[in-house]
Amino acid sequence: MEKINLCEGVVAQMMDTEAWGNVSGDFPFSEAQLEKYADKLDWKEVSGNTNIFWSVQMLEKFKRRIDWTALSCSLQEENVSAELLEKFKDNWNWEEISDNRCLTPELIDQFADYINWKALINNWSCCEKLATEEFIRKYSDRIPACDFKDSRLWREMVEKKEKEIKKQICLC
């Protein structure tokens, strides 16, 4: 059996790097802690960390370090505001934001030009609240017709219609 010759310094450095990566992904860092340990952190992991409450000030301070795609995927509903989306609208990955549960009807209205509509109509967490004829009428010019019938939104609307029909049958 071949022995691997690892010097202590290399092993310690590898362990340190991996441990910091793990901590980066789940520790609820404050702004001060992010600043203090900025050079040790794995910023892709930090960006995907759902235990960090990102303020506009924090995003501004760390915007060059943040992995915006990872943050767009992991953004929490309680963390999202129109101000936050507006301030960094050119940084967000809008396809990921459109597939995120953080979007409210008000945010959809405000950022309709940035939304990836194919992703939105397949967003499991949004479709139940969006599955209305009013929504379809309002955004008919934005919803991609070629993707609509195969979307989660379509299935949600058909399920609602099925329930209406069954209820109607039972009342007769």
Predicted regions and their residues:
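Alpha-helical scaffold segments
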Residues: 1-172
